[in-house]
């Protein structure tokens, strides 16, 4: 009998018995199991052992007014989750507005980076340059490392700040700068400060022939002056209380000139008009000593009983000051004494006094 002719339900009970005993009975039986639903259920009902789907159950929940500790905990959790959702939505809205103002990226850019995308890599050919943190003055540190060779150290590329009157000094290197700083690109000289004195105390002149006892001379008696390089110390001051000449000629003033020894060219003084009152001075390295010796020389004239014209006991120095009368030519620098004054429009020649002041030069009083 062929296998195809055998009835479908025919089987040997002896052969099938041992096979049925060894086989798992659960695998043979088809038990209809209840399908597991993925739809959400009510949490309040679930706490009390009841399974109810949320669809259409919001207003029909039997435990909606329950205040047990489980239901209270669920209520607090819902409030916290609602606050978190509201905060996240507010932050996303602010971020979108900020990006739209700058126009840097689309509003979906934060979500794009949030999903774990990698940042753009360094382009090929620039792997050997590692940028370092910037210094306060804008200098950037670059560490060039050529392939196959060891670098000698980071190189500092810096640029000087904007032009300023003060000299620029680089900032000392920080802990990340093992190399040396480059020298500054330029150096500026320090600024020159000049002070202007508006009022000077008066020193009385001793009486001598040709001068009024009420004559006063303006001399600075406080503090050294500010030095200004490239000039010679000269002090000139008009004296008041002099007799006036003819009305047709302008009245001249007596003047005191102080000049140190060693000046290459003598300074000449021109007569001043009646309305002019000038106090011109420039400071030098020993201005204060010059003023003190000049004041001592003026005090020494009190005890002098010589003629109006006093010649120094020391041979004259070529560097002494050249004396000018209001209407006479200057005396030569290398001559002895003073040259005679030529004819003048004034009725009588004016007296003068010259006194030598050691190494500082000579002092001359004109009228």
From Swiss-Prot:
<dbReference type="GO" id="GO:0005634">
    <property type="term" value="C:nucleus"/>
</dbReference>
<dbReference type="GO" id="GO:0001741">
    <property type="term" value="C:XY body"/>
</dbReference>
<dbReference type="GO" id="GO:0007548">
    <property type="term" value="P:sex differentiation"/>
</dbReference>
<keyword id="KW-0862">Zinc</keyword>
<dbReference type="GO" id="GO:0000981">
    <property type="term" value="F:DNA-binding transcription factor activity, RNA polymerase II-specific"/>
</dbReference>
<dbReference type="GO" id="GO:0046872">
    <property type="term" value="F:metal ion binding"/>
</dbReference>
<protein>
    <recommendedName>
        <fullName>Doublesex- and mab-3-related transcription factor C2</fullName>
    </recommendedName>
</protein>
<dbReference type="InterPro" id="IPR036407">
    <property type="entry name" value="DM_DNA-bd_sf"/>
</dbReference>
<dbReference type="GO" id="GO:0042802">
    <property type="term" value="F:identical protein binding"/>
</dbReference>
<dbReference type="GO" id="GO:0007290">
    <property type="term" value="P:spermatid nucleus elongation"/>
</dbReference>
<comment type="similarity">
    <text>Belongs to the DMRT family.</text>
</comment>
<feature type="region of interest" description="Disordered">
    <location>
        <begin position="103"/>
        <end position="138"/>
    </location>
</feature>
<comment type="function">
    <text>May be involved in sexual development.</text>
</comment>
<dbReference type="GO" id="GO:0000785">
    <property type="term" value="C:chromatin"/>
</dbReference>
<keyword id="KW-0539">Nucleus</keyword>
<dbReference type="InterPro" id="IPR031577">
    <property type="entry name" value="DMRT-C1/C2_C"/>
</dbReference>
<keyword id="KW-0238">DNA-binding</keyword>
<keyword id="KW-0221">Differentiation</keyword>
<dbReference type="GO" id="GO:0070828">
    <property type="term" value="P:heterochromatin organization"/>
</dbReference>
<keyword id="KW-0804">Transcription</keyword>
<keyword id="KW-0479">Metal-binding</keyword>
<feature type="DNA-binding region" description="DM">
    <location>
        <begin position="42"/>
        <end position="89"/>
    </location>
</feature>
<keyword id="KW-0805">Transcription regulation</keyword>
<dbReference type="GO" id="GO:1990837">
    <property type="term" value="F:sequence-specific double-stranded DNA binding"/>
</dbReference>
<dbReference type="InterPro" id="IPR001275">
    <property type="entry name" value="DM_DNA-bd"/>
</dbReference>
<feature type="region of interest" description="Disordered">
    <location>
        <begin position="1"/>
        <end position="25"/>
    </location>
</feature>
<keyword id="KW-0726">Sexual differentiation</keyword>
<dbReference type="InterPro" id="IPR026607">
    <property type="entry name" value="DMRT"/>
</dbReference>
<dbReference type="GO" id="GO:0007141">
    <property type="term" value="P:male meiosis I"/>
</dbReference>
<dbReference type="Pfam" id="PF15791">
    <property type="entry name" value="DMRT-like"/>
</dbReference>
<dbReference type="Pfam" id="PF00751">
    <property type="entry name" value="DM"/>
</dbReference>
């Amino acid at each position: 009998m062929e296998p195809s002719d055998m009835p479908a339900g025919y089987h040997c009970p002896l052969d099938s018995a041992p096979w049925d005993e060894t086989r798992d009975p659960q695998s043979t039986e088809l038990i209809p199991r209840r399908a597991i639903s993925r739809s959400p259920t009510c949490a309040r009902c679930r706490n009390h052992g009841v399974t109810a789907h949320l669809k259409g159950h919001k207003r029909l929940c039997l435990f909606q007014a329950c205040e047990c500790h489980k239901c209270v905990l669920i209520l607090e959790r819902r409030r916290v989750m609602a606050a978190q959702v509201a905060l996240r939505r507010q932050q996303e809205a602010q971020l979108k507005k900020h990006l739209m103002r700058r126009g840097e990226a689309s509003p979906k850019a934060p979500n794009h980076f949030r999903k774990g995308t990698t940042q753009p890599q360094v382009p090929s050919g620039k792997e050997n340059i590692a940028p370092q943190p910037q210094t306060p003055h804008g200098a950037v540190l670059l560490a060039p490392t050529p392939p196959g060779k060891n670098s000698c150290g980071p190189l500092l590329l810096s640029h000087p700040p904007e032009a300023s009157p003060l000299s620029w000094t680089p900032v000392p290197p920080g802990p990340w700068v093992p190399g040396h700083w480059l020298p500054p690109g330029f150096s500026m000289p320090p600024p020159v400060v000049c002070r202007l004195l508006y009022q000077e105390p008066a020193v009385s002149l001793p009486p001598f022939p040709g001068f009024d006892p009420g004559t006063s001379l303006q001399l600075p008696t406080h503090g050294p002056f500010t030095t200004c390089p490239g000039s010679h110390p000269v002090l000139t001051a008009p004296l008041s209380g002099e007799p006036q000449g003819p009305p047709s000629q302008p009245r001249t003033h007596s003047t005191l000139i102080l000049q140190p020894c060693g000046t290459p060219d003598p300074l000449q003084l021109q007569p001043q008009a009646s309305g002019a009152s000038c106090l011109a001075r420039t400071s030098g390295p020993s201005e204060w000593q010059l003023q003190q010796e000049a004041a001592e020389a003026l005090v020494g004239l009190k005890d002098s009983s010589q003629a109006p014209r006093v010649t120094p006991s020391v041979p004259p120095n070529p560097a002494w000051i050249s004396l000018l009368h209001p209407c006479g030519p200057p005396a030569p620098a290398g001559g002895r004494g003073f040259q005679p004054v030529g004819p003048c429009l004034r009725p009588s020649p004016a007296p003068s006094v010259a006194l030598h002041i050691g190494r500082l030069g000579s002092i001359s009083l004109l009228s």
